[in-house]
Amino acid sequence: MNLNATLFAQMVVFLVLAWFTMKFVWPPLINALDERSKKIADGLAAAEKGKAELDAAHKRVDQELAQARNDGQQRIADAEKRAQAVAEEIKANAQAEAARIVAQAKAEAEQQIVKAREALRGEVAALAVKGAEQILKREVDQTAHAQLLNQLKAEL
């Protein structure tokens, strides 16, 4: 093997190039790669954090929806109870009003019956007086008396 000056010159140039690359070219490349790696890691961490926040938000939304459903069902149940109570109150009021109207109608009917009886008594008394008057005006014989009673009976 033949070693000559060209080989040494090439070795020196190679070593200078290697030193220059290590000193000036390699650090910016390493920094760029490190920055890129850091950006990728930050992006992945942000994606994981976003995914975790999204999952937490989904859980909160599900809980709030469940709570809203429960609240809605509770409000519906309360409204049904209030409606039932109002219906019962209206029914009780209607029954009381019906009982009052029936009692009032019975009282009015009773008053009318009493008035009719009094009027009938007055008429019967007048007819009895009239019949007695007619009997007393005529002779007292059996056939005339029977005829007058039949006539009074027909008038009643």
Swiss-Prot record:
Which SUPFAM superfamilies is this protein grouped with? F1F0 ATP synthase subunit B, membrane domain (SSF81573)
UniProt cross-references to HAMAP family, sorted A to Z: ATP_synth_b_bprime (MF_01398)
Assembly, in brief, is: F-type ATPases have 2 components, F(1) - the catalytic core - and F(0) - the membrane proton channel. F(1) has five subunits: alpha(3), beta(3), gamma(1), delta(1), epsilon(1). F(0) has three main subunits: a(1), b(2) and c(10-14). The alpha and beta chains form an alternating ring which encloses part of the gamma chain. F(1) is attached to F(0) by a central stalk formed by the gamma and epsilon chains, while a peripheral stalk is formed by the delta and b chains.
GO CC annotation terms, alphabetical: plasma membrane; proton-transporting ATP synthase complex
Task: Supply the name of the protein.
Answer: ATP synthase subunit b
Q: Which InterPro entries match?
A: ATP_synth_B-like_membr_sf (IPR028987), ATP_synth_b/b'su_bac/chlpt (IPR002146), ATP_synth_F0_bsu_bac (IPR005864), ATP_synthase_B_chain (IPR050059)
Q: What does this protein do?
A: F(1)F(0) ATP synthase produces ATP from ADP in the presence of a proton or sodium gradient. F-type ATPases consist of two structural domains, F(1) containing the extramembraneous catalytic core and F(0) containing the membrane proton channel, linked together by a central stalk and a peripheral stalk. During catalysis, ATP synthesis in the catalytic domain of F(1) is coupled via a rotary mechanism of the central stalk subunits to proton translocation.
Q: Spell out the Gene3D superfamilies in the cross-references.
A: 6.10.250.1580
Gene name in the database record:
atpF
Molecular function terms in GO for this entry? proton-transporting ATP synthase activity, rotational mechanism; proton-transporting ATPase activity, rotational mechanism
The membrane topology term of the UniProt record is: Single-pass membrane protein
Q: Which family is it part of? A: Belongs to the ATPase B chain family.
Record keywords, A-Z: ATP synthesis, Cell inner membrane, Cell membrane, CF(0), Hydrogen ion transport, Ion transport, Membrane, Transmembrane, Transmembrane helix, Transport
Q: Does the keyword Membrane apply?
A: yes
Per the UniProt record, which residue ranges are transmembrane? 7-29
Q: Where does this one sit in the cell?
A: Cell inner membrane
